[in-house]
């Protein structure tokens, strides 16, 4: 029989049977990162790089080999998760029907007089749900209460369920295989973080209050990351992409003055100042903004944002994406279901972020945004995501 090192090389090239690879004691040189626990699985093939073992990750890590730190806020607080993605079993209505404590208010640190979700007092099994629109790793939840007429209201305990289709839900379990009850809050404002023992793969996440103080009032955030781990900012916001690599079809000049130009190099997410975005010089579907990434990269998504011009709100409401490796031959991103150019939903105001992830990542050096619809003028700030 070949020596173990040679056998390992052969197995990597030829996909050995599980029983053969187990003989190598693959877990002896732990292939799991970040403290992950390697466990052999006899007579099973997991289907990725190695058969016959699996990695159990520490809290806050995910991936086949626990290679990804996975505790990013998923978008409730910053608005990346839209109101339409948040639902609940019921809503409390107070103050003569004028105050509605609806689920879309349940965003961490939201301010205001009515700033959280509360279920109806008649709801015997309340829940609030987030639709992430795609499968993601979910690794934890941050909860917070709120107040009504100076009364502290919060969840003291809750359960978490998750689903891939929005119909069949599984609860997170404890070591005794029972539905795990997570510790909640102790006052109206303090935040409490619960990290799951293992990440869950989910598109839908539900919180079920089980014990509450005064009322089951909630603001919260989900923690996790993308399944493929390739959704990092590529350098627009942090300026690692130089100005000269951001170009456009045209640029608007307020009052026709060069001093008041809305240059393509300003199209950086969250850029501040009086002139803080790219604005096209004319209206029409022939306008575009182009980013040169410097080399071919895997691009998995985009975050867009509008801007304000002397009080006038302006943004791109929908757009297409084109990509190229030579800046001469362009391909428009296709909707995998229809086979036609995909139109992505854009923004609805001048400041919120709108994230769109590609179902099929693209490999390209040059990326163009092609506005389809807009409010007032074509105005854009953005970040590209990938690795």
From Swiss-Prot:
Tissue specificity as recorded in UniProt = Mammary epithelial cell surfaces and aortic media. Overexpressed in several carcinomas.
Main localisation, per the record? Answer: membrane
Signal sequence coordinates: 1-23
Phosphoserine carried by residues: 42
Q: Where is this motif: Cell attachment site?
A: 46-48
- Compartmental location: Membrane; Secreted; Cytoplasmic vesicle, Secretory vesicle, Acrosome membrane
Keywords assigned by UniProt? Answer: Amyloid, Angiogenesis, Cell adhesion, Cytoplasmic vesicle, Disulfide bond, EGF-like domain, Fertilization, Glycoprotein, Membrane, Phosphoprotein, Repeat, Secreted, Signal
Modification after translation is described as: Medin has a ragged N-terminus with minor species starting at Pro-264 and Gly-273.
Q: Name one GO biological process term.
A: cell adhesion
- Which GO terms fall under molecular function for this chain's record? integrin binding; phosphatidylserine binding
User: A Pfam family matched by this chain, by name?
Assistant: EGF
Q: How does it sit in the membrane?
A: Peripheral membrane protein
- Cited SUPFAM superfamilies: EGF/Laminin (SSF57196), Galactose-binding domain-like (SSF49785)
Residue span(s) of domain F5/8 type C: 70-225, 230-387
| GO CC annotation | acrosomal membrane; collagen-containing extracellular matrix; endoplasmic reticulum lumen; external side of plasma membrane; extracellular exosome; extracellular region; extracellular space; extracellular vesicle
Sugar attachment sites are: 228, 238, 325, 329, 350
The free-text domain note is:
The F5/8 type C 2 domain mediates high-affinity binding to phosphatidylserine-containing membranes.
The function of this protein is: Plays an important role in the maintenance of intestinal epithelial homeostasis and the promotion of mucosal healing. Promotes VEGF-dependent neovascularization. Contributes to phagocytic removal of apoptotic cells in many tissues. Specific ligand for the alpha-v/beta-3 and alpha-v/beta-5 receptors. Also binds to phosphatidylserine-enriched cell surfaces in a receptor-independent manner. Zona pellucida-binding protein which may play a role in gamete interaction.
- Name the UniProt record assigns to this protein: Lactadherin
């Amino acid at each position: 029989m070949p020596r173990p090192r040679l056998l390992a090389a052969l197995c990597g090239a030829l996909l050995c049977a599980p029983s053969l690879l187990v003989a190598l004691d693959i877990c002896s040189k732990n292939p799991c990162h970040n403290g992950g626990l390697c466990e052999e699985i006899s007579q099973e093939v997991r289907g990725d790089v190695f058969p016959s073992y699996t990695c159990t990750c520490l809290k806050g890590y995910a991936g086949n080999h626990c290679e990804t730190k996975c505790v990013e806020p998923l978008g409730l607080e910053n608005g990346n998760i839209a109101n339409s993605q948040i639902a609940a079993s019921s809503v409390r209505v107070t103050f003569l029907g004028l105050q509605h404590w609806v689920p879309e208010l349940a965003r961490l640190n939201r301010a205001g007089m009515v700033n959280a979700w509360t279920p109806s007092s008649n709801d015997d099994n309340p829940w609030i749900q987030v639709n992430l629109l795609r499968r993601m790793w979910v690794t934890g939840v941050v909860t917070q209460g709120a107040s009504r007429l100076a009364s502290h209201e919060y969840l003291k305990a809750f359960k978490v369920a998750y689903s891939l289709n929005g119909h069949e839900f599984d609860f997170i379990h404890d070591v005794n295989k029972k539905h795990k009850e997570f510790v909640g809050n102790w006052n109206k404002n303090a935040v409490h973080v619960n990290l799951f023992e293992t990440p869950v793969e989910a598109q839908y996440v539900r919180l079920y209050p089980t014990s509450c103080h005064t009322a089951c009032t909630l603001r919260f955030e989900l923690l996790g990351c993308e399944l493929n781990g390739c959704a990092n900012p590529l350098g627009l916001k942090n300026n690692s992409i130089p100005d000269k690599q951001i170009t456009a079809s045209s640029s608007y000049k307020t009052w026709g003055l060069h001093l008041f130009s809305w240059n393509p190099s300003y199209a950086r997410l969250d850029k501040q100042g009086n002139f803080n975005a790219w604005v096209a010089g004319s209206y029409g579907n022939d306008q575009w903004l182009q980013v040169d990434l410097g080399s071919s990269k895997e691009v998995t998504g985009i975050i867009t944002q509008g801007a304000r011009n002397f009080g006038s709100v302006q943004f791109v409401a929908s757009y297409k994406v084109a990509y190229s490796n030579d800046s001469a031959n362009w391909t428009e991103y296709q909707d995998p279901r229809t086979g036609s150019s995909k139109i992505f939903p854009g923004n609805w105001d001048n400041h919120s972020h709108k994230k769109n992830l590609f179902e099929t990542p693209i490999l390209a050096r040059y990326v163009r945004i092609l506005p389809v619809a807009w409010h007032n003028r074509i105005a854009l700030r953005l970040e590209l995501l990938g690795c």
